Amino acid sequence: FKVDEEFQGPIVSQNRRYFLFRPRN
């Protein structure tokens, strides 16, 4: 995925944060 690194950058960070902070069910 190398289309808009400037736009996808922050989104990936948010996704990583969501996965890191999501409960382990």
UniProtKB/Swiss-Prot annotation:
The modification Asparagine amide is found at N25. Pfam families: NMU. InterPro entries: Neuromedin-U_amidation-site, NMU_C. Transmembrane segments: none annotated. It is found in: Secreted. One of its GO terms (biological process) is regulation of smooth muscle contraction. PROSITE patterns: NMU. It comes from the Eukaryota. Keywords: Amidation, Cleavage on pair of basic residues, Hormone, Secreted. GO terms for cellular component: extracellular region. Its main location: secreted. The keyword Metal-binding does not apply. Stimulates uterine smooth muscle contraction and causes selective vasoconstriction. Belongs to the NmU family. This is Neuromedin-U-25. The gene is NMU.
